[in-house]
Amino acid sequence: MQATKTHVRKGETVMVIAGKDKNKTGTVMQFLPKKDGIIVEGLNMVKRHVKARGNEPGGIKEKEASIHISNVMPYCAKCAKPVRVRLKVLENGDKQRLCAKCGNSLEK
């Protein structure tokens, strides 16, 4: 199976462009290639009924659910809006990810 190519990376700030958390930003915590999804910190919260285990009490807990990658875009702090990604090849052969509008680097 081929690796999924995506426009967002783990640790990057993204903005949700569709769904119940539209226009909210957060950091990508995990990438799920089989589901083409990501888990964003503090967004798409769902309630789970958890059974007590050992010394951990049971109850209703909130956790992040996955969001499809088509519903998020990288967030540029300089533009203060979601942007498309442009790749620039440097002299040494490395690729740098840039904001397509302002040219600001999207690297961590």
Swiss-Prot record:
Keyword set, alphabetical order: Ribonucleoprotein, Ribosomal protein, RNA-binding, rRNA-binding
Domain of life (superkingdom): Bacteria
Family: Belongs to the universal ribosomal protein uL24 family.
HAMAP family listed in its UniProt record: Ribosomal_uL24_B
Protein name according to UniProt: Large ribosomal subunit protein uL24
Biological processes per GO annotation: translation
Signal peptide positions on this chain: none
Entry-linked PANTHER family: MITOCHONDRIAL RIBOSOMAL PROTEIN L24
GO CC terms in record: ribonucleoprotein complex; ribosome
NCBIfam families, A to Z: rplX_bact
Gene3D superfamilies: 2.30.30.30
Pfam families in the record: KOW (PF00467), ribosomal_L24 (PF17136)
Molecular function terms, GO-annotated: rRNA binding; structural constituent of ribosome
InterPro entries per the UniProt record, alphabetical: KOW, Rib_uL2_dom2, Ribosomal_uL24, Ribosomal_uL24_KOW, Translation_prot_SH3-like_sf
Species: Pelobacter propionicus (strain DSM 2379 / NBRC 103807 / OttBd1)
SUPFAM superfamilies, A to Z: Translation proteins SH3-like domain
Subunit structure: Part of the 50S ribosomal subunit.
Gene that specifies this protein: rplX
Function comment: One of two assembly initiator proteins, it binds directly to the 5'-end of the 23S rRNA, where it nucleates assembly of the 50S subunit. One of the proteins that surrounds the polypeptide exit tunnel on the outside of the subunit.
